[in-house]
Swiss-Prot record:
Stretches with biased composition (Basic and acidic residues): 71-85
Pathway in which the depicted protein is active: tRNA modification; N(7)-methylguanine-tRNA biosynthesis
Domain of life: Eukaryota
Gene that encodes the chain: TRM82
Role according to the record: Required for the formation of N(7)-methylguanine at position 46 (m7G46) in tRNA, a modification required to maintain stability of tRNAs; its absence resulting in tRNA decay. In the complex, it is required to stabilize and induce conformational changes of the catalytic subunit.
UniProt similarity note: Belongs to the WD repeat TRM82 family.
UniProt name for this protein: tRNA (guanine-N(7)-)-methyltransferase non-catalytic subunit TRM82
A Gene Ontology BP annotation from the UniProt entry: tRNA (guanine-N7)-methylation
GO CC, any one term: tRNA methyltransferase complex
Subunit (UniProt): Forms a heterodimer with the catalytic subunit TRM8.
Annotated localization: Nucleus
Residue numbers carrying Phosphoserine: S93
WD repeat boundaries on the chain: 1-47, 48-99, 100-147, 148-192, 193-237, 238-279, 308-354
SUPFAM superfamilies hit by this protein: WD40 repeat-like
Length: 444
């Protein structure tokens, strides 16, 4: 049975008039017009052929290896002293049995003037720069593609709207001027680094105008470095016992972090003090399922060891609330940040959904989630939910009318697209955060 591939992420413009959605290797654009009317505003697909690139690279390596083989033939002899010709290259061609290749699009960000959209493509480990033109039939136009040697994992945009900070899979951080001309071969040196995979990065400024880069990694570390003098480490934030998957910044001093621990951490990043922790383990327990059982080789005799991790934590822009979700669960948890007790966190609300949450984003005082709705029966729905703060009720509520109309817009926009309408077994892996957890084998 074919279904529309679930949405992997959402990003909304400041005024809410534009929404960008990721499905596989595509970015869909929608215009939002009140009340609850959506208009399809174009699609961009990453047509970079990673398989063909792999074949081309292999062919070049084989050609070079064949030349080396010819030179080495003089040195190779049989037991009888006869020359042996070796014409086969050492480098194998990709073929049957090779692992599947997934061309994810990640890390959607808008510049502050919203004239450009920045994203990352797994297909060629690149940073994508789009022009955003709301008057055009297709609002996105790819302008530049900066390729890296390692996959970009997280990005942050500087205030000048031209500098993008990129954290990669192998622990290096780079600074790119998106007005520059992309290099044919990546030669840039990193501005700072970790010894582990980077998971998040934020470029922030203190009240005195000094800039800092905050980075988190798989090794439980949060590092604060001066910018642009990134060789100067301001401080480390210690407290996590497992990987840090996501960080977010509040106003002034506040930093929030989460990951493989069963706690949310609140920090004063200026002083390095851990202000508070919020243990959510009892709250999430009813939402855990078989997907949270530890891998068989790390299980006990009763097969009841569970492992869970926060996939994303994000703060409301104007309100004292922060939301997060645990990977492969059907809820988001909203916490209130105390204004009296500095950095103190308290439960505000838990919002449940019919399917697992895939992504969480924020637009002003609205939270947005995308859902793993591949098991939806009948007409496919519940692609995303828009969650608004109701001042009168002092609580967050799902705007069902807006969400339902968005479902209809998604269905209409992908009709006839054989890439986005796919078999269930061909859906991209949607739960990758748990793979960051280290077990005994990583320390041996």
């Amino acid at each position: 049975m074919s279904v529309i591939h679930p949405l992997q992420n959402l990003l909304t413009s400041r005024d809410g008039s534009l929404v960008f959605a990721i499905i596989k290797n595509c970015i869909l654009s929608f215009k939002y017009q009140s009340p609850n009317h959506w208009e399809f505003a174009g699609k961009w697909s990453d047509d970079f052929d990673k398989i063909q690139e792999s074949r081309n690279t292999t062919a070049k390596e084989q050609q070079g290896q064949s030349s080396e083989n010819e030179n080495e033939n003089k040195k190779l002899k049989s037991n009888k002293g006869d020359s042996i010709k070796r014409t086969a290259a050492k480098v194998p061609s990709p073929g049957i049995g090779a692992p599947p290749i997934y061309s994810y699009i990640r890390n959607l960000r808008l510049t502050s003037d919203e004239s450009r959209l920045i994203a990352c493509a797994d297909s060629d480990k690149s940073l994508l720069v789009f022009d955003v033109d709301k008057t055009s039939k297709n609002v996105l136009k790819l302008r530049k593609r900066f390729c890296f040697s390692k996959r970009p994992n997280a990005i942050s945009i500087a205030e000048d709207d031209t500098t993008v900070i990129i954290a990669d899979k192998f622990g290096d951080v780079y600074s790119i001027d998106i007005n520059s001309i992309p290099e044919e071969k990546f030669t840039q040196e990193p501005i700072l680094g970790h010894v582990s995979m980077l998971t998040d990065v934020h470029l922030i400024k203190d009240s005195d105008g000094h800039q800092f880069i905050i980075t988190s990694d798989r090794d439980e570390h949060i590092k604060i470095s001066h910018y642009p003098q990134c060789f100067i480490v301001d401080k480390w934030l210690f407290g996590h016992k497992h990987f840090v998957s996501s960080i977010c910044c509040g106003k002034d001093y506040l930093l929030l972090s989460a990951g493989g621990d069963d706690k949310i951490f609140a920090w004063d990043w200026k002083t390095g003090k851990n202000l508070s922790t919020f243990d959510y383990s009892s709250l999430i327990k009813p939402y855990l399922n078989d997907q949270h059982l530890a891998p068989p080789r790390f299980q006990n005799e009763n097969n009841d060891i569970i492992e869970f991790a926060v996939s994303k934590i994000i703060k409301s822009k104007n309100l004292p609330f922060v939301a997060f979700f645990v990977e492969a669960t059907k809820c988001i948890i909203i916490l209130e940040i105390s204004e009296k007790q500095k950095g103190d966190l308290a439960l505000k609300q838990i919002i449940s959904f019919p399917y697992n949450v895939i992504s969480l984003s924020a637009h002003n005082d609205e939270f947005q989630v995308t859902l793993d709705n591949k098991e939806s029966s009948g007409v496919q729905k519940n692609f995303a939910k828009f969650i608004e703060y109701n001042l009168n009720e002092n609580s967050f509520v799902v705007n069902n009318e807006k969400s339902n109309e968005f479902d209809s817009a998604i269905i209409q926009s992908v009709q006839g697209d054989s890439n986005l309408v796919t078999k269930k077994e061909e859906i991209y892996p949607l739960y990758n955060v748990s793979s960051l957890r280290k077990h005994g084998e990583h320390y041996s």
